[in-house]
């Protein structure tokens, strides 16, 4: 067996035929972050909390959830299971999570996000907790653009800027058809290249 044949064999075993990894964000896509905030404050809708303009609500919420198990307690979106199934159908059975930690509470928030995943959804192939999601935009070995499904436009922009394929999706606002179309379009983009 030549070195070339070995390399080819290893390459083919590691590669899923140039298939992308599909990364799903957690908050806003699978887990209802704002639903968690509403529950914590005992309000019907989080916008009720924005009436007091003297407060920096974002800072207050972050201060209040830092060091707690907040992320483990988030409600799951009703569409989460179907979204995961859709991704698995596209990839041939795989999906990964790529979620950001809470700034200033990295280890703790990562721990409770992982606990949420363990308790609420089937186990992903990989769980990545990073503030730099875009470093996973392309497969390092093959250069295949990976897919990110995320609710934040800035994350999608950075992902695309790093050569990945982004699908902007907010579970409380968008239909799963948006994800379905995004996955179908990825296939078309790849075929056209």
Identify the function of each model-found stretch.
Residues 12-65, 161:
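Active-site neighborhood of HAD-like aspartate-dependent phosphohydrolases
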Residues 31-34, 39, 95, 104-108, ...:
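Short catalytic/ligand-binding loop motif for oxyanion handling, primarily in non-cytosolic enzymes
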Residues 71-76, 80-113, 117:
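Substrate-recognition element of Asp-dependent hydrolases with the DxDx(T/V) motif
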Residues 98-146, 156:
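Substrate-recognition "cap/lid" segment bordering the active-site pocket of phosphatases
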Residues 137-142, 179-190:
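Short amphipathic alpha-helix with an adjacent loop that forms part of the alpha/beta core around
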Residues 146-185:
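Acidic, Mg2+-coordinating phosphoryl-transfer loop and its flanking beta/alpha structural elements
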């Amino acid at each position: 067996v030549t070195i070339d044949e070995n390399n080819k064999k290893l390459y083919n075993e590691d590669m899923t035929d140039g298939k992308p990894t599909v990364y799903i964000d957690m908050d806003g896509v699978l887990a209802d972050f704002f639903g968690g905030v509403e529950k914590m404050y005992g309000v019907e809708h989080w916008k009720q909390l924005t009436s007091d303009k003297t407060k920096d609500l974002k800072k207050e919420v972050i201060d209040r959830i830092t060091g707690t198990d907040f992320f483990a307690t988030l409600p799951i979106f009703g569409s989460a299971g179907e979204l995961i199934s859709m991704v698995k159908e596209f990839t041939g059975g795989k999906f990964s999570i790529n979620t950001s930690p809470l700034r200033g509470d990295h280890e703790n928030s990562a721990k409770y996000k992982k606990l949420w995943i363990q308790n609420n959804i089937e186990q992903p192939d990989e769980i990545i907790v990073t503030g730099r999601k875009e470093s996973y935009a392309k497969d390092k070995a093959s250069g295949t653009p990976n897919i990110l499904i995320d609710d934040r436009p800035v994350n999608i922009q950075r992902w695309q800027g790093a050569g990945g394929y982004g699908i902007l999706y907010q579970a409380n606002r968008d239909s799963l058809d948006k994800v379905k179309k995004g996955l179908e379009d990825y296939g078309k983009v790849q075929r056209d290249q």
